[in-house]
Structure formats: C-alpha cells, structure tokens
Amino acid sequence: MDILLANPRGFCAGVDRAISIVESALEKFGAPIYVRHEVVHNRYVVNKLKEAGAVFVEELDEVPDDSIVIFSAHGVAKTVREMAKSRALKVFDATCPLVTKVHMEVHRASRKGSEAVLIGHAGHPEVIGTMGQYENREGGMYLVETPDDVARLKVKNPDDLCFVTQTTLSVDETSDVIDALRKQFPKIQGPRKDDICYATQNRQDAVREMAGLVDVMLVVGSRNSSNSNRLRELAEKVGSKAYLIDDASMIETVWLEGVKAIGVTAGASAPDVLVQNVIARLRELGGNMVVEHPGREENVVFEVPPELRII
C-alpha cells in the first residue's frame, strides 16, 4: 500500500500566527492567559496550550478583571471588542488577517448603508464575528448557506447590495451560492478579491488532484474544523472514500482492506506531528512507500504583534 501525502497540508499562516501569539503571551506574561474560544479548531493544539497555562473561555464574563485575553483566529464581533475595552482587559488579537479583511468589507458596507450578505455556516465562530461587524440599523446583514437560502432572501434595496464569504468554505460551495445571488440580484457587488483564503484554496486543490490517484483519503483534523470537513467532503465528491480523523488512533483497519494507495492530508489547523503519527500507523498496517504529491509552495507569513515578539 502506497502512501501519498498532499502538498500543501496542515498549518496555514493564520493558524501559525494564532498559536504563536498564545505561546508568546504565556512566555512573556506567564499563566494564566485567557483565550476567547478555541484559538484554532484542533483538539491536540488546544490541549497542548491548556497544559502550558492557557485558559479557554467562550465569553468575556468568564475572564477575571486585570487579565490578559486573546481573541481566536476566527475573529470576534465588535461588541466583544467593546466589552473588553470597557473592562480595560489587555487584549491580543489572533484574528487571521484574511478574516480581518472580510470584517473590513462588512464594516465599509455598514458605514455606507449598503446591505450585505454573508455566505457561511450558521453558528461558526467566524460567521458570528463577521455578522457582528455590521451595525447600521437602516441597512441589513443577511446570512445564506445554500442557493435555496438565496431564493428565500428578501432585502430592502437590491440595487445597493454586496456579499462576502466565510474564508474556510469550499470553492465549489460558494460558487453555486454566488451564482444564485448574481442571478437574483444582478447589481450585487462582490469583494475585489475572493474571500476564500489561499490556504483553503491550496489544500482543496491538492485534494482534488490526489483523489483520483488513491482508493482512500485520510483527512487529519478535528470535527469542529470547517476547512477539514470541507476537505473530506471534496475528496468524496471527486470519487474517493474519505475519513476525517483527529489522530492515528482513529484509523480503522477495515478502511484499508484491498487498498493499494492511500492519501493523507491535514486541515489548516492540524499540526504536522499528527500527520507523522498517521504515517507511522499506516506503515504498521502495511504501508510502504511514502510519496509527497507535488503541489503549490506556500511562503506566506503573518507576524505576531510587536509586543509579543521574542528576541
């Protein structure tokens, strides 16, 4: 059984930055450091940071006065920032810069009074944060997930409307919804550049290229990771059996029966150590040659805040 590794896979620049912010804050200020929501959606990463002294909370009222709090990579609503400011909490913002770009687009629409549509999954932290950038009561902010949602959408002024997308969705998902929006609202304006992030796009492209070469695709990532779920769905859509696993212990031998080639990739919030453990386990189960599939090289780096840079 050959093992094919997707390239690129695993950590993106936004995740790397978010984790570095928490680690640097712990190193500089000591524990506890409070983090609003899981800094990234990966159980292994979160548990490691907990062991180092990070305390994960869902709301700021769980954070004691005079504490340091970090906002997760998914971003937060304006009301959360305002609450942190009113309590004089020391804040470090680990919001991915690509999510911040979407926030700025929504803020501009709100300021102008244009209505805005967000393509995203209800309840996802990034979606909650992005929806929370719109404050204009005279306008409107709407969430859609499918073309059917678009068909039911009623807006106040279809001539002054824009859309943005959740960064971790699949390109296939958003294209259908965008087509529906443009058909129903011919004057709708989109972002100057696609909101789907480079890492999401690259990892999806790698899976799309590999899926036809393997019998089974393993996606390393947590179940609450949006981009990891999209990778599994994409592999299945292209025609490969696919499984989302937190780690090597979740591999079931029945998946490998009759398999000549197996693919391995990882969501943008999954560390490489988990991938290496999966490879080791596959070798124990009969895997031999490990081949890294050619893909797009990534050299994007997002800097941590100056105050947290360790010299």
From Swiss-Prot:
(2E)-4-hydroxy-3-methylbut-2-enyl diphosphate binds at residues 41, 74, 124, 167, 225-227, 269. Binds 1 [4Fe-4S] cluster per subunit. Its EC number is 1.17.7.4. Pfam families: LYTB. The keyword rRNA processing does not apply. Dimethylallyl diphosphate binds at residues 41, 74, 124, 225-227, 269. The active site is at residue 126. Pathway: Isoprenoid biosynthesis; dimethylallyl diphosphate biosynthesis; dimethylallyl diphosphate from (2E)-4-hydroxy-3-methylbutenyl diphosphate: step 1/1; Isoprenoid biosynthesis; isopentenyl diphosphate biosynthesis via DXP pathway; isopentenyl diphosphate from 1-deoxy-D-xylulose 5-phosphate: step 6/6. InterPro entries: LytB/IspH. Keywords: 4Fe-4S, Iron, Iron-sulfur, Isoprene biosynthesis, Metal-binding, Oxidoreductase. It catalyses: isopentenyl diphosphate + 2 oxidized [2Fe-2S]-[ferredoxin] + H2O = (2E)-4-hydroxy-3-methylbut-2-enyl diphosphate + 2 reduced [2Fe-2S]-[ferredoxin] + 2 H(+); dimethylallyl diphosphate + 2 oxidized [2Fe-2S]-[ferredoxin] + H2O = (2E)-4-hydroxy-3-methylbut-2-enyl diphosphate + 2 reduced [2Fe-2S]-[ferredoxin] + 2 H(+). [4Fe-4S] cluster binds at residues 12, 96, 197. It is an enzyme of class 1 (oxidoreductase). One of its GO terms (biological process) is terpenoid biosynthetic process. Isopentenyl diphosphate binds at residues 41, 74, 124, 225-227, 269. GO terms for molecular function: 4 iron, 4 sulfur cluster binding; 4-hydroxy-3-methylbut-2-enyl diphosphate reductase activity; metal ion binding. Its cofactor is [4Fe-4S] cluster. Catalyzes the conversion of 1-hydroxy-2-methyl-2-(E)-butenyl 4-diphosphate (HMBPP) into a mixture of isopentenyl diphosphate (IPP) and dimethylallyl diphosphate (DMAPP). Acts in the terminal step of the DOXP/MEP pathway for isoprenoid precursor biosynthesis. Belongs to the IspH family. NCBIfam families: ispH_lytB (TIGR00216), PRK01045.1-2 (NF002188), PRK01045.1-4 (NF002190). This is 4-hydroxy-3-methylbut-2-enyl diphosphate reductase. It comes from Aeromonas salmonicida (strain A449). The gene is ispH.
